[in-house]
């Protein structure tokens, strides 16, 4: 009888099963790690452990993986399914020699030497009983729950106290066939395999648990005694005419206000609460791209998460997802407005550090904050901050605030050698709890101060919020970014470390815009965002159900056949399923009559629904602009369409943070797809197939409000070429309000002054303003914009500008 079949062993497994709850990382190993189900598989574990193998055996069946107790049959010989690097640590005495375990690698290599067709996948498996990183000088806790090399007695204690927080992590497989063919099959290669595996397990543990945490007061004293803060304290004392003791005390107060106080115990409790909360709120959370971030952690990068900011839920969602994806929740830069009782202390112990909205002119606070941020980077803690500075009230990305990015870049310039990588993150929701509040704020209502009562009020309204979306975008490694932007930056900094480089501000601005572009590149298309995009382009926010389903199918084909980027995700299903989902979420309403079903957006939430539309409008804006060209011209050529897109794209890029590299190629692909779908026909030019005109008109409706804004701006520029930039912004905003009142435009962003400011800056960069404006270019773009508008809207704009001229 084998050991695992004995009554004693079965009893221990039964007891362990009652005590242990296992979380698997990644949740779908075959899919996420590209394991080949057709090839044999062997698990590699760091230490021989009956409890670890038992925990692994409980999950392998559900995942479609072979049991660790099931031997591998190779060429008629039985081989253990699990290979360990070292034996279990005994309660007393020395661990047994590793030679026995090394022989397992030798046997596998030998089998490949004898069988040229054999290709066994070595899959590293790491098990963690709890994820406490430990604290500096935390000797007592380390003695009781020493995690790296526990004896059987300590392992029993770990299972008893931390069994509900057991993580099993699978890693990318190694092909023994590749190793044998490339490096041979002798003992030297077996040693190399074992050595590489040990390094892998060591790095993996750091990814899962993070670096050790310093004692808070010890950290404060270390920071206060740093050279930069000593200088800042002396300068504060001199400038404010106070003693150095008082200045030092003020610096300590700032540190206490800013610094996080991370607690693994609170994180474990929060994990249980958040699991309940997400299950209560959402039907599921969709994640894309986590594996690349795990790899960056594994490779030793300092990771800084830069998500978009939709809701206060963002703080919780990203940390929760990272925890379940086998990464340490980051230290989060939170606005000081969230430091209210009791949430503030809880956020702080969950990893939040607090930042004032503005600290310009407060040199001591700036120095303290910068030194604290440097310390986080140096110690290897991942960090998260929101580059928008606040939550978007319109659903579009806000113009980035560059302060935190500048501080991060300065840390690199001061000599941080470890690669620092920004990870853009797109966060999306089928329902944002604050969206009704946002509309009130945009309408002029004063923003309420955050309090515990707001939290209770939100929790009282828990319901079916559909799905959540977390997409990790293309990472930006700062050393590589600097090498591209300023090839000789190292030499320049080394020659004069104290001098601020002249190129720093423009490089920071470029980096901030690249972050926002990469966030939008990772957008998630859902049933709510896509149905709102269609219905809000219709005249009464309503369509026949069959027409809506057909339009959604067209959009899905565009998004899947011409993917915006490889980081974008698109909802599964067809138009019919998306409409059903929207109805279930109560975002749409259904009215039936003898002629069929009509699906609409209720008037009371139509403005709120623009928020969800704006989340993904950038994905469909160019197809919409192409459709507008086709429907507003009886006949138009490919080159004419490309020219119009080329004129408008720089403005679209500026306001929507788009990153299309080749607009001409994209236009060609869109036109070819329209031909394939029998929406248009081509001879000497394009004409619309009469039976498909409604589909193209609906698609064109998405860009209509954007074109109206551009028409306002270029009509003003054409008639007032000497207009100052500030006047252009003010006049454009005034005419937009008039146009909205006359034509029923309710989208909040249409009246957003900041949007006109962004456009005016871009217009100056493009050479349209008076300093170097080209009248012929302005006239051409005005004609294009006017030509794509409905006649009534065009006339309102022309008449309004004429009235301004005669005023």
Swiss-Prot record:
Which major enzyme category is it?
A: transferase
Q: Entry's SUPFAM superfamilies?
A: Glycerol-3-phosphate (1)-acyltransferase
What is its membrane topology?
Peripheral membrane protein
* InterPro entries according to UniProt: GPAT/DHAPAT, GPAT/DHAPAT_C, GPAT/DHAPAT_LPLAT, GPAT_PlsB, Plipid/glycerol_acylTrfase
Protein's UniProt keywords contain GTP-binding: no
What does the record give as EC number? 2.3.1.15
Q: Name one GO cellular component term.
A: plasma membrane
Q: Which GO terms describe its molecular function?
A: glycerol-3-phosphate O-acyltransferase activity
Where is the protein situated, by its record's location annotation?
Cell inner membrane
| Short motif HXXXXD motif, span | 308-313
Q: What are the alphabetically sorted keywords of the record?
A: Acyltransferase, Cell inner membrane, Cell membrane, Lipid biosynthesis, Lipid metabolism, Membrane, Phospholipid biosynthesis, Phospholipid metabolism, Transferase
Q: Which reaction does it catalyse?
A: sn-glycerol 3-phosphate + an acyl-CoA = a 1-acyl-sn-glycero-3-phosphate + CoA
| Pathway(s) this gene product operates in, as recorded in its UniProt entry | Phospholipid metabolism; CDP-diacylglycerol biosynthesis; CDP-diacylglycerol from sn-glycerol 3-phosphate: step 1/3
PANTHER family per the record? DIHYDROXYACETONE PHOSPHATE ACYLTRANSFERASE, GLYCEROL-3-PHOSPHATE ACYLTRANSFERASE
Family membership, please give it: Belongs to the GPAT/DAPAT family.
- Which NCBIfam families has this protein been placed in? plsB, PRK04974.1
Q: What is this protein called?
A: Glycerol-3-phosphate acyltransferase
The species is Shewanella woodyi (strain ATCC 51908 / MS32)
Taxon lineage: Bacteria, Pseudomonadati, Pseudomonadota, Gammaproteobacteria, Alteromonadales
